[in-house]
């Protein structure tokens, strides 16, 4: 495949279309700010609105159209911008629903993200009758083979190792796959999946449409775009376009760290009006807080990276279904949680780096869905909060007494 427009330029040693600091320049200016104007199938539109989307996010306004038109697309966007739905909608629009063959393949760096993408695709494609299978490690290979052989799902989403394995053993046929999506490409490459990704490309048709999404654009990501993409459309969603819109942000002054627990317990009634996610900075603290809350007879569930896959799945299932209402977790899993009903996020600890702030609270009010974020702030935290306000050009106000009315 020709590398398209990414030839190296002399000025700053980076590929053309790149600024020196690893940010791509957009070469596509068309913006469609309404799902109704995208010429989507009626059944897909129903799925989009039923899912709770009202208007497209910045990346959706820009990237859905070129994806649907069949262009190769590179989109630089953080998580929390609505990128999953961007490629989910693009895939679903291009599906031939009566063709019972796999027509799109999506790669993601982690099992959680792959399962999350699968859920979004199934929800958006619900009225179309689209089928989607998650092909991930940590599950039974034999079951997977039987599943893929029994009926080919329209869409396969998975982690590179397992997807390559299924292609290699010919349980997953590349014959009808016309769209290949790499989500969080920077993450996949930094986790050492480069060889598998290259091998997967070798097994796919040479004129396949490639859509690559990445928060950052390091050399190894650019190498993939240069090698496997043809004259790609480049779309950059800048930080300030990440949405804090519609999210009311508050802080509560908590004089001392040890008083946070009582503050949280006082808020508990408010939390359970809907569903809430509480973020802490360490796994140990997640366990500690969960125990303390249980000891006081509050119902909460906890999720962190030390738990095994089965346990994590059960907890997420309970939370998604609404049978558990308060989830305590760490940043590690912030990216894997996108639950419709979450309209309240509590930062028990402020995030250690400011980028994570949007990953956490971007959950609460995505895409026109409103949300409330409450930050617990000690004396030492005030500087961090000011830093966050400056970084996102936003204001965090003291929490009013009637916060329950806002949720």
UniProtKB/Swiss-Prot annotation:
Q: Which reaction does it catalyse?
A: ATP + H2O = ADP + phosphate + H(+)
- Cite the GO molecular-function annotations of the record: ATP binding; ATP hydrolysis activity; mRNA binding; RNA helicase activity; translation initiation factor activity
Which segments constitute the Helicase ATP-binding domain?
64-235
- Domain of life (superkingdom): Eukaryota
User: What EC designation does it have?
Assistant: 3.6.4.13
Q: Which Gene3D superfamilies match?
A: P-loop containing nucleotide triphosphate hydrolases
Q: Which InterPro entries match?
A: DEAD/DEAH_box_helicase_dom, EIF4A_DEADc, Helicase_ATP-bd, Helicase_C-like, P-loop_NTPase, RNA-helicase_DEAD-box_CS, RNA_helicase_DEAD_Q_motif
| Sequence motif DEAD box, residues | 183-186
Where ATP binds, per the record, is at 77-84
Q: Which PANTHER family match?
A: ATP-DEPENDENT RNA HELICASE DBP3
Q: How does it assemble?
A: eIF4F is a multi-subunit complex, the composition of which varies with external and internal environmental conditions. It is composed of at least EIF4A, EIF4E and EIF4G1/EIFFG3. Interacts with EIF4E.
Question: What is the protein named?
Answer: Eukaryotic initiation factor 4A-II
> What is the protein's species of origin?
Gallus gallus
Q: What would be the name of the gene that encodes this protein? A: EIF4A2
């Amino acid at each position: 495949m020709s590398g398209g427009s990414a030839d190296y330029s002399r000025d700053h040693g980076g590929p053309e279309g790149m600024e020196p600091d690893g940010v791509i320049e957009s070469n596509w200016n068309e913006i469609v700010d309404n799902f109704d104007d995208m010429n989507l199938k009626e059944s897909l539109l129903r799925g989009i609105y039923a899912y709770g989307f009202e208007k497209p996010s910045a990346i959706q306004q820009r990237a859905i159209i070129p994806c649907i038109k069949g262009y190769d697309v590179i989109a630089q966007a953080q998580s929390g911008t609505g990128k999953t739905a961007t490629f989910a909608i693009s895939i679903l629009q291009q599906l031939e629903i009566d063709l019972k063959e796999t027509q799109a393949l999506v790669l993601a760096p982690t099992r959680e993200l792959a399962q999350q993408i699968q859920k979004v695709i199934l929800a958006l494609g619900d009225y179309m009758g689209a089928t989607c299978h998650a092909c991930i490690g940590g599950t039974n290979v034999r079951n997977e083979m039987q599943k893929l052989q029994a009926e080919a799902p329209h869409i396969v989403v998975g982690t590179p190792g397992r997807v390559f394995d299924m292609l290699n053993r010919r349980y997953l046929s590349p014959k009808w796959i016309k769209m290949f999506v790499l989500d969080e490409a920077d993450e996949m490459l930094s986790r050492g999946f480069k060889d598998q990704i290259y091998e997967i490309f070798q097994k796919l048709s040479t004129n396949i449409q490639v859509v690559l999404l990445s928060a950052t654009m390091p050399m190894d990501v650019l190498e993939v775009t240069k090698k496997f993409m043809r004259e790609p459309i480049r779309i950059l969603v800048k930080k300030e376009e990440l949405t804090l819109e519609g999210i009311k942000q508050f802080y509560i002054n908590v004089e001392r760290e040890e008083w946070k627990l009582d503050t949280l317990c006082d808020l508990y009634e408010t939390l359970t009006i809907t569903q809430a996610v509480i973020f802490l900075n360490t796994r140990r603290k997640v366990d500690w807080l969960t125990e303390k809350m249980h000891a006081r007879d509050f119902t909460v569930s906890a999720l962190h990276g030390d738990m095994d896959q089965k346990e994590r799945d059960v907890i997420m299932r309970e939370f998604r279904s609404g049978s558990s209402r308060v989830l305590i977790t760490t940043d590690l899993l912030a990216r894997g949680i996108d639950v419709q009903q979450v309209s309240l996020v509590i930062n028990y600890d402020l995030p250690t780096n400011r980028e994570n702030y949007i990953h956490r609270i971007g959950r609460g009010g995505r895409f026109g869905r409103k949300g409330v974020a409450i930050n617990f702030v000690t004396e030492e935290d005030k500087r961090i909060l000011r830093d966050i306000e400056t970084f996102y050009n936003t204001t965090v106000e003291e929490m009013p007494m009637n916060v329950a009315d806002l949720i």
